[in-house]
Amino acid sequence: MLDLQKKLSPAFYTILSLPSTAMGFALSVQISALSWILSTQYNLAIHEIGLVWAAGPIAGIFGQVIVGMISDEVWFWGGRRRPFILIGGTLSALMLLALPFIGVISTGLGFESVVGIAILIALTLDLSINISFNPTRSIIADVTPSGNERTKGYTWMQTISGTFGVGAYAIGAIWGNYALIYVGAIIVFLISFIPIWFIKEPEKLSEKEEVLSVTPDKNKWISALFSIKPLWGFLAYAPLGMFKKLSGQSLSPGILELACLLLTVYGIFQVLKQPESEVANQRSNEIGFQRILAAHAFTWMGIQTMFIYMFAFIQNKMNFLSENDLGKVISLSFLLLNAVAAILPAIFLQPLSEKWGKV
């Protein structure tokens, strides 16, 4: 163990924050460049771009759940989090590099359409980011004592990751999205692959953390599936919609959408109808988690719509822009969004929470 880690010095907190920063940076590149490059370089229609984006989050949801379960219980390559960070960081960098070459890859593999390869690359990129997200956060808890030191670790992570995220959009706004893709791939690989070798993980978690990490239900995979009940409709719609599009199958308009909407409403109703106060503590925590999922699901519908389709809005409203300038405007827009998101909580929300209380 390095002296930096023993002393929990600022340098160690910086190193500890970099793997999570890498995943956040990769996500920023994806948000800024994926829709833009699919539209401008590969001429995909707006509904095809939505199809490409649908693949990633589904894999990400399952990836986070699965990796979150198994990363507590494995040990290889000198750690329980290290393998997932190394694999996820390397694959994320490679998939970013693949974005400008989707057409070349598709032609080389003998595909007439780039949609299938674009879905595969987007799927791998999103899955790579998501399988690393939980380990990059869990490693902070693994190597810091509970209390102020652990809180400090997460604070450093948020600060450094947020700064890099704003920096990603700044690169795209100034030099364009192609520069962002190539620079992003290098940064993601370096700050995910190198720092993790300077962090020594404990081979045995503390007794309290072991209890929290072990799911008492023997059928933990089924338990995990039921814990995300409010997302069932969303989870079903994306793969079924992709299959319908790629296979050429036809359904009556709105049938699939209505069925998935009803499934979503059913899942949310099941969560909301049972008061947390009337169930055991562990079940109460699960219900609270499911209610957060329900709220976030609809929130993310709006946010993802902005991420995916903002390029089309700008193309329509500012059709005088060149393809490169379009990419710069998209990056500038997300730069301003993230800058406001970084400043607003400290300046406005914190004073309001102190006045009216936190919820």
What are the roles of these predicted feature ranges?
Residues 1-9, 109, 115-120, 131-132, ...:
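Intracellular loop-helix junctions on the cytosolic face of multi-pass helical membrane proteins
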Residues 2-60, 236, 240-253, 289-320:
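Helix-loop boundary and gating motifs at the non-cytosolic
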Residues 62-79, 176, 343-358:
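Helix-to-loop junctions at the C-terminal end of transmembrane segments
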Residues 21, 51-58, 123, 155-163, ...:
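Transmembrane alpha-helical cores of Major Facilitator Superfamily
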Residues 29, 33, 66, 133-139, ...:
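Transmembrane alpha-helix boundary/hinge residues in polytopic small-molecule transporters
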